Amino acid sequence: MQPPVPGPLGLLDPAEGLSRRKKTSLWFVGSLLLVSVLIVTVGLAATTRTENVTVGGYYPGIILGFGSFLGIIGINLVENRRQMLVAAIVFISFGVVAAFCCAIVDGVFAAQHIEPRPLTTGRCQFYSSGVGYLYDVYQTEVTCHSLDGKCQLKVRSNTCYCCDLYACGSAEPSPAYYEFIGVSGCQDVLHLYRLLWASAVLNVLGLFLGIITAAVLGAFKDMVPLSQLAYGPAVPPQTLYNPAQQILAYAGFRLTPEPVPTCSSYPLPLQPCSRFPVAPSSALASSEDLQPPSPSSSGSGLPGQAPPCYAPTYFPPGEKPPPYAP
């Protein structure tokens, strides 16, 4: 019988194939780690660009980066490799879900809430109260002109505002942001717009790369090198309980044929006899000495166990049978 495989998905791969799989896994994990660093960098740059626009696109980068770090450690481990790679796959899976959500949120926010056309055409103004004033304390009113007339807009210090996006005299707020607080110029708003789209693209890239990396690590964690293959306990030898085979296993042992049971010379009403026809006792004794053992008993090594047959005894006329003896 063949020895059992040590695991449900244990793969016997030569050392060269295992090394190639290891390099492939390291390449994918390293690429995912690099993308995670870019996601965190771009996300932090976007969320610190303004005060009133919060970006959460860097959270998937943290989760994916931690999962990639665990994956690099698990690939280079010899013992506890499977446990470490399973933990890496779990973190990468959570990072993939977070990247999917943040890619949608950042993309929708950049497309719906930031209008780049007034910024690129120079129709937005930047207001600064000067050195020594805090932008969250000092406020001023500026005049915005629209088709319906002019209106007053309160802005804080270090704010980029766009009167084209502000609905004068309208109770409904504008869907697009018309002011960006805490910037050093209106060019920072354009940078924020580009960073949001870059964060969305990087999150999509991290989404697909995370799925592929999790699949590669899942295939690598079940691989077992030939040098570390440990077979299970050996199967005990199967014992044969056939008496004939156990007896014939001893060298030089020969079976002696047992004598064939014969009928007694004393006549009885019913007496056991062999398969031979009824004969006198003297003739039966001489035939027993000359007859060789039967092939069935000598060939198989088992004693002849033919069922005894009982035949009635015939007496010549005028002779009485012997008295019955139990």
Curated annotation (Swiss-Prot):
Which InterPro entries does its entry note?
TMEM255
TM spans (from-to): 26-46, 55-75, 85-105, 200-220
The protein's topology relative to the membrane is: Multi-pass membrane protein
> Which keywords, in A-to-Z order, does the entry hold?
Membrane, Transmembrane, Transmembrane helix
In terms of Pfam families, this protein maps to: FAM70
Tell me the protein's name.
Transmembrane protein 255B
The gene for this chain is TMEM255B
Taxonomy, superkingdom: Eukaryota
Instruction: Give any Gene Ontology cellular component.
Output: membrane
- Give each disulfide bond as a residue pair: none
Reply yes or no: does the keyword DNA repair apply: no
Transmembrane found in the keyword field: yes
Biological source species: Homo sapiens (Human)
Family designation: Belongs to the TMEM255 family.
Listed Pro residues bias regions:
305-326
Q: Where does it localize?
A: Membrane
Q: Where is this region: Disordered?
A: 284-326
